[in-house]
Amino acid sequence: MKKFAVFASGNGSNFEAIVTRLKEENWDASAALLVCDKPQAKVIERAEAFHIPSFAFEPKSYENKAAFEQAIIEQLRLHEVELIALAGYMRLIGDTLLQAYGGKIINIHPSLLPAFPGIDAVGQAFRAGVKVAGITVHYVDEGMDTGPIIAQKAIEIDEHDTLETIEQRIHKLEHKWYPSVIKQLLGLNNRGEKA
């Protein structure tokens, strides 16, 4: 059985969408671990509801980034994680984690990269007046939203859209497509079985 981890910092709606899809489709895979850098985040409650172990840590309690990333690596190895999916994890991945899991860390970003990297991507797109927005799933490298693109999905924006409606539509895209990309990268077929 393939095992993956999800890293999140907040509410965890993408985490829930991934795990729900895994269970509904009975994947031959396991969400083996949630990693969270905010011990009070709602996503931890979601993990508990699904009986998924979590590693919640306070970055300031570690000497430096390398130290907390080493603690994360120990948890990933303990849970035999093969793939890491960032889902609203609001930290850049450092050298320590990249050296251990390079090419096995993916992220979902709410824009059609390379446009609008970083925070508030949907707001940036809305203020720019673009006619097309979307999501990007990409491999993580040392930069911010700069890794090789795996998949993109787009939506058209019209004059009736508001920032809120665009955000809602982007979230729906994320919840639909991120689990599909994870399943594909785990080498599972459409029924969630090993391909």
UniProtKB/Swiss-Prot annotation:
Gene Ontology BP annotations: 'de novo' IMP biosynthetic process
EC number(s) from the headed UniProt entry: 2.1.2.2
Catalytic reactions of this protein: N(1)-(5-phospho-beta-D-ribosyl)glycinamide + (6R)-10-formyltetrahydrofolate = N(2)-formyl-N(1)-(5-phospho-beta-D-ribosyl)glycinamide + (6S)-5,6,7,8-tetrahydrofolate + H(+)
InterPro entries listed in its UniProt record: Formyl_transf_N, Formyl_transf_N_sf, GART, GART_AS
Positions bound to (6R)-10-formyltetrahydrofolate: K65, M90, R91, L92, I93, N107
GO molecular function, one term: phosphoribosylglycinamide formyltransferase activity
Pathway: Purine metabolism; IMP biosynthesis via de novo pathway; N(2)-formyl-N(1)-(5-phospho-D-ribosyl)glycinamide from N(1)-(5-phospho-D-ribosyl)glycinamide (10-formyl THF route): step 1/1
Enzyme class: transferase
Protein residues bound to N(1)-(5-phospho-beta-D-ribosyl)glycinamide: G12, S13, N14
Pfam families, alphabetized: Formyl_trans_N
Gene3D superfamilies, alphabetized: Formyl transferase, N-terminal domain
Domain of life: Bacteria
Residues of the site described as Raises pKa of active site His: D145
Keywords: Purine biosynthesis, Transferase
GO cellular component labels: cytoplasm; cytosol
Active site: H109
Family membership noted in the UniProt record: Belongs to the GART family.
Known role: Catalyzes the transfer of a formyl group from 10-formyltetrahydrofolate to 5-phospho-ribosyl-glycinamide (GAR), producing 5-phospho-ribosyl-N-formylglycinamide (FGAR) and tetrahydrofolate.
Matching NCBIfam families: PurN (TIGR00639)
Name recorded for this polypeptide: Phosphoribosylglycinamide formyltransferase
Organism taxonomic ancestry: Bacteria, Bacillati, Bacillota, Bacilli, Bacillales
